[in-house]
Amino acid sequence: MTIFDNYEVWFVIGSQHLYGPETLRQVTQHAEHVVNALNTEAKLPCKLVLKPLGTTPDEITAICRDANYDDRCAGLVVWLHTFSPAKMWINGLTMLNKPLLQFHTQFNAALPWDSIDMDFMNLNQTAHGGREFGFIGARMRQQHAVVTGHWQDKQAHERIGSWMRQAVSKQDTRHLKVCRFGDNMREVAVTDGDKVAAQIKFGFSVNTWAVGDLVQVVNSISDGDVNALVDEYESCYTMTPATQIHGEKRQNVLEAARIELGMKRFLEQGGFHAFTTTFEDLHGLKQLPGLAVQRLMQQGYGFAGEGDWKTAALLRIMKVMSTGLQGGTSFMEDYTYHFEKGNDLVLGSHMLEVCPSIAVEEKPILDVQHLGIGGKDDPARLIFNTQTGPAIVASLIDLGDRYRLLVNCIDTVKTPHSLPKLPVANALWKAQPDLPTASEAWILAGGAHHTVFSHALNLNDMCQFAEMHDIEITVIDNDTRLPAFKDALRWNEVYYGFRR
């Protein structure tokens, strides 16, 4: 069972009574056939539920109103099978607060050249019925997605499925609670921001809990539960000699397990699905949570270090979007560079907290090593390299008057040399279009040093996310040129200034 099983998407057919009962009967028959086929053949993440035909303003308004109040409804897919006068949709669309996709399709793929008549033409009017619907969306300034293609086309299936992921993610975000254990890393700017504005824009709430509250729960974990979790570690990971039974760091592993169990219990009791820590707020904890955070991220929790609640929320959102897709998604940080002409590289990592979902190794190494930051006992952590191939890094920043999402398309590569003295998980990548352009564009746009790294999602996913939440997106990829990029930043400043 996945999060998508908790939601459904309503399939709504627009028509009118002008064409008579026989035409409406055929429209209903076609709709039932299409919905059944999509549910069985299209590999959609969510179930489509066919709703009664929308043929009058009152019927359409009722469907939109019901969608708003049904927690299982993640959004609406609308198909204008015949011509459906768009003034009928105004009241419904005015109140609709769920994502909307217009499926611009028709029942038949090919025209029946020898038999086509006006009955056929009146029944299959998507070509201009869809344009009427599109006009009212533009006139109302209502953001909605459009997918064109025959309902049996695999590309159309993929695009609808991708939109469904966004729709479910948006509904999940409205219920998302972010827990901050302690505050921001002191004097850091980009991890701060307006939490009230974030809740208004995205729906997620952000609140702080004292580390002492967490420590109480951690200390309540039984030794039996700790030992059972360590047994799981033994089966899932390659334990270094120091972490094995009778090893000099075995106690640190036991303490890491206790912290993991305590954190998970705290998060579950509070209904949190994202959280932050900071090495400056560890009073009562024996070590900085490393292994615990890595494993919780792998279970779907959002996380970011140093109190960075925006990145923690974004990671949770992207985890939901990517559920069931190949590849992982993790908290990340651009840490250091390798400058080599024609082969500039970025080494991404963090002090400890990189999600094993992006690991190339089947059994990562579990080790305990010294960490100079935080002033606590040596923390346990998983060490691994990252899968290779196309990926993205994304950052959500607060500009005061709006949110900006930055996305850099990257290509992860194999580490050319072993890293015997680097005791943390890491990812190595080439930034698109090149490191100088990518880094300069990122800096000019104000991108954070914390990001969400994903093999599972792509640029199109993040563009859909930005559109659905009505926020600015800044893209850095192989098409990026700095002069045009700077111009776009200036134009966006004017555009969003007019929208205040």
Swiss-Prot record:
Its EC number is 5.3.1.4. InterPro entries: Ara_Isoase_C, AraA_central, AraA_N, AraA_N_sf, Fuc/Ara_isomerase_C, Fucose_isomerase_N/cen_sf, Lara_isomerase. One of its GO terms (cellular component) is cytosol. Mn(2+) binds at residues 306, 333, 350, 450. It comes from the Bacteria. Pathway: Carbohydrate degradation; L-arabinose degradation via L-ribulose; D-xylulose 5-phosphate from L-arabinose (bacterial route): step 1/3. CDD domains: L-arabinose_isomerase (cd03557). Keywords: Arabinose catabolism, Carbohydrate metabolism, Isomerase, Manganese, Metal-binding. One of its GO terms (molecular function) is L-arabinose isomerase activity. The keyword Ligase does not apply. Its cofactor is Mn(2+). Binds 1 Mn(2+) ion per subunit. It is an enzyme of class 5 (isomerase). Pfam families: AraA_central, AraA_N, Arabinose_Iso_C. Belongs to the arabinose isomerase family. Catalyzes the conversion of L-arabinose to L-ribulose. Homohexamer. This is L-arabinose isomerase. The lineage of its organism: Bacteria, Pseudomonadati, Pseudomonadota, Gammaproteobacteria, Enterobacterales.
